[in-house]
Amino acid sequence: MLGVLRRYHAHDVLGLENIPKSGPALLAVHHSLATYDAFLFGHAVIRETGRTFTGLGDDKLFAVPGVRRFASASGILPASPENGRKLLNEGHLLGVAPGGMREALRPSSERKHVLWDKRKGFVRLAIQTGAPIIPVACPSADFLYTVYENRLTKLAYKKLKLPVPVARGFGLTLVPRPVRLTTYVGEAIVIPDGAIDDPETVDTVHAQVTAAIEALLDRRDTRDS
């Protein structure tokens, strides 16, 4: 399936040289509604670098049998500080989407917005393990679907933490639009030696990563030039 989607969207990754050839790194990924752009990126990393790449996913994913099997087969583990710390301490590449479901459910009026304001656990994890943070974003993924702002989506997320989007893709269907997808990998944000997990340090690094993601989201696919 991912091979089909890769060809359908002419998916490409720019900036793979920013991923270290060895040692731990935390890849902070912007979250789209479609989500599979992140899977395409993960498989590209494995294919092009030969490195093990593991992502952390929302616990809700693992409550649905079919989705659980797909997530597990794609190297996704339930999100927890323990899982993240173990992988980084073992020297692996770790992928996280700090915005989570909340960011994925953004209406199209908030395309390319970064909703990480209160999501700082990934920064603490990087500080605790010394792993660099690498920003990753696929701007055009926000154009695969038109997502409508509505009370049902907000209520389902607020009360039950369930994704109930109202969206459409190609025409009036849920088939994703044949948009070219380019994932951009930014330069690593290195945690300073001796950095401690205190609010000031966390806020400083968090602001750096957020600004880097926003810059990547402003990039335009040069193949459309």
Predicted regions and their residues:
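Helix-to-loop junction immediately C-terminal to a conserved catalytic motif
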Residues: 1-31
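Hydrophobic alpha-helical segments of integral membrane proteins
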Residues: 1-4, 67-70, 156
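Short secondary-structure boundary/capping segments
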Residues: 3, 17, 68, 85-86, ...
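Short gly/ser/thr-rich secondary-structure transition/capping motifs
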Residues: 6-13, 75-79, 166-167
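Short, well-ordered coil/turn elements that cap or connect secondary structure elements
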Residues: 6-8, 48-50, 128
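A generic secondary-structure signal marking the coil-to-beta-strand transition
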Residues: 9, 23-25, 37, 51, ...
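Catalytic core of membrane glycerolipid acyltransferases/transacylases, capturing the structured
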Residues: 21-84, 89-90, 100-115
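Non-catalytic C-terminal accessory region of glycerolipid acyltransferases
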Residues: 86-225
